UniProtKB/Swiss-Prot annotation:
Oligomeric form and interacting partners: Identified in the spliceosome C complex.
Name recorded for this polypeptide: Heterogeneous nuclear ribonucleoprotein A3
InterPro entries: hnRNPA1/3_RRM2, Nucleotide-bd_a/b_plait_sf, RBD_domain_sf, RRM_dom
Residues bearing PTM N6-acetyllysine: 134
Originating organism: Rattus norvegicus
Length: 379
């Protein structure tokens, strides 16, 4: 005889979830990268178990790891947790602030390898740039689309000052940086029937900061390592300026150090007459994404600051330079096969960092070292 639950009590859905998520315990339609959080500012006393004990309150964890120095086994001050579905990640982020072992920590959505090479990828911002919108797209179209991600503060559809014609891009500001992080993980969005590209909107000062950090990264020419601009080619973006051009993101008017918008090229000339988003060293500046810079968290330099590193966590150690992965390797499935068993990265072979310093991630995900940027010589 089947025993039915009391009225009003939700029935368990574990069987349905298991079927939906498959044998590995997660939804096969949701990539691991979207289910993963970087946890910064950890106490050096925090262990895998205590980190798991805290974050499993918001869902099922398929992986949880505190990164440690492979020699000393001391915590590096950060870790990763991976949930079984994106809904659980959202729940954990909605529950901020988080305190683990008596210390307030900083969770952020993990940045993929491909996105990590972009200037400002690790900056905390509340504004996005929406490019490639068409003449028939109005403010309400943008609001209808983006309000499902979070609370919108302002929307600016940019127009030409003289003609009043739309310039093919807009800015949307939210009340929470996590909303931006969640949106930019999905690079392309269909708005009012048109494919649009969405990026973090960086001010002129933030662009210059990102450019100066890249300049310290070494390597020859931009993020790819062996020359070649980030953009390349010369296709038009939006209605006018070159998106890639020969100066990378700077476009025709930007030259090899083209700016984010700066005048003639860039995002459709976006920034124009001395606006905040014009000028600066640009997306195609030289060098890797490394060097000093502003802090990502609360224990030192930036993502490549000071002694390098993911916030300079663990007193100057960096995300690769102090042996993030030590001698261990990542395989094509993002499984870490070194001294700490986990599966938190979308890596493709090679040592995660070696023992190099001078740039974050120790010369790149796929490199064994070197002083290049995030993927300097093997991208």
């Amino acid at each position: 005889m089947e025993v039915k639950p009391p009225p009003g009590r939700p029935q368990p859905d574990s069987g349905r979830r298991r079927r939906r998520r498959g044998e590995e315990g997660h939804d096969p339609k949701e990539p691991e990268q979207l289910r993963k959080l970087f946890i910064g500012g950890l106490s050096f006393e925090t262990t895998d178990d205590s980190l798991r004990e805290h974050f499993e309150k918001w869902g099922t964890l398929t992986d949880c790891v505190v990164m440690r120095d492979p020699q000393t086994k001391r915590s590096r001050g950060f870790g990763f947790v991976t949930y079984s579905c994106v809904e659980e990640v959202d729940a954990a982020m909605c529950a901020r602030p988080h305190k683990v072992d008596g210390r307030v920590v900083e969770p952020k959505r993990a940045v993929s390898r491909e996105d990590s090479v972009k200037p400002g990828a690790h900056l905390t911002v509340k504004k996005i740039f929406v490019g490639g919108i068409k003449e028939d797209t109005e403010e309400y179209n943008l609001r209808d689309y983006f309000e499902k991600y979070g609370k919108i503060e302002t929307i600016e559809v940019m127009e030409d000052r003289q003609s009043g014609k739309k310039r093919g891009f807009a800015f949307v500001t939210f009340d929470d940086h996590d909303t931006v992080d969640k949106i930019v993980v999905q690079k392309y969005h269909t708005i009012n029937g048109h494919n649009c590209e969405v990026k973090k909107a960086l001010s002129k000062q933030e662009m210059q900061s990102a450019g100066s950090q890249r300049g310290r990264g070494g390597g020859s020419g931009n993020f790819m390592g062996r020359g070649g601009n980030f953009g390349g080619g010369g296709g038009n973006f939006g209605r006018g300026g070159n998106f890639g051009g020969r100066g990378g993101y700077g476009g025709g008017g930007g030259g090899s150090r083209g700016s984010y918008g700066g005048g003639d090229g860039g995002y459709n000339g976006f920034g124009g007459d001395g606006g905040n988003y014009g000028g600066g060293p640009g997306y195609s500046s030289r060098g890797g994404y490394g060097g000093g810079g502003p802090g990502y968290g609360n224990q030192g330099g930036g993502y490549g600051g000071g002694g390098g590193g993911y916030d300079g966590y663990n007193e100057g150690g960096n995300f690769g330079g102090g042996n993030y992965g030590g001698g261990g390797n990542y395989n094509d499935f993002g499984n870490y096969s070194g001294q700490q068993q986990s599966n938190y990265g979308p890596m493709k072979g090679g040592s995660f960092g070696g023992r190099s310093s001078g740039s974050p991630y120790g010369g790149g995900y796929g490199s064994g070292g070197g002083s290049g940027g995030y993927g300097s010589r093997r991208f």
